[in-house]
Amino acid sequence: MDSQNILARENELKPQQDSASNISIITKALQELGYSWSDVCLDNVDYRQFKYEDRVRWTTYIQPALAYPMIHRALSQISRNKTAATDYVESKGYVTPKSVTVTTGNCQHSELENLLEKSQALVVKPVYGSLSRGVTRNISDAQILHNTVKAALLNDDCVIVQQQFYGDEVRLVVVDGVLAAAVLRQRPQVIGDGEKQLRQLIEQENAQRGLISDTMVSYPMLNEINCDMPNLNLDSVPYAGETVVLGYGSMIANGASVYDVMDVLAAGYKHMSEDIASSMGAKFLVVDVITRDPHNFTDYCFLEFNTSPVLKLFYSCRDGQHADVAPILANAIHKITK
């Protein structure tokens, strides 16, 4: 092997490497198990190799996603394909959104219009995509729907149109057949007290956000950008106990709040995620669902799979009660690479 094509730097973080990146978080967890590591560059792609007792046990991409050794090829393919993932979960008897897959040259006009008639709103997104890339929500007009699909097909050969389900996202992490973590990604919201105007409640929420510390992701202030729910009346006075959802964001950067809900999650979510992972032979799988109430397994909908989640999310619970998944993943890596 040509040594000029390999650049190795053992156990030394590159200056530009984010300490909250996936590779940094998993590296720290593996080091605590006694692993050493080195970076190599092969054909202009950066990799990291992990050694245990002088034997290379795992090699992974450094960016953007990690190639976990627990992920087999079929699982990776199904997870990346939102249509395949939805079909698989539906075949297991769990709730999925009604959907239509559209490809270049086959726009399925009648099926799309039929789906729109049966839905409050639709969402358009690429079949292959992550981090909300290319996602358009709240489509309720036929012409807007066709224009959105047409525009989406300029960037992707295949898009999926689904019924939009309103609720908050829950990320379920299954490792070695057992639900290991569950975090709620709660949309930006405030709770009324029967006295304050909505604008005052938002100001109060922002004051609380300013006190949040010990999170890998910083919480932004709520503003007109992340409070994008239509028809918000800032002068209104929500009644005591009323939850006012302010926006659609499911990421912290878009106003969402993250909480560890492992101890309060309804048992049905645990059974569902473990059942799906087991049936796929998955040693590691992330199942994302949308729910109106994580305490009840009655009003939910499957969203998508993930095989390389953003780890810093689990260490950004706003109350400081984080979901410590890195050691769990490190132990799974250690076990499967023996």
Predicted regions and their residues:
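C-terminal active-site "lid" helix and adjoining low-complexity regulatory extension at the edge
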Residues: Q17, M251-H271, S278-F284, T291-K338
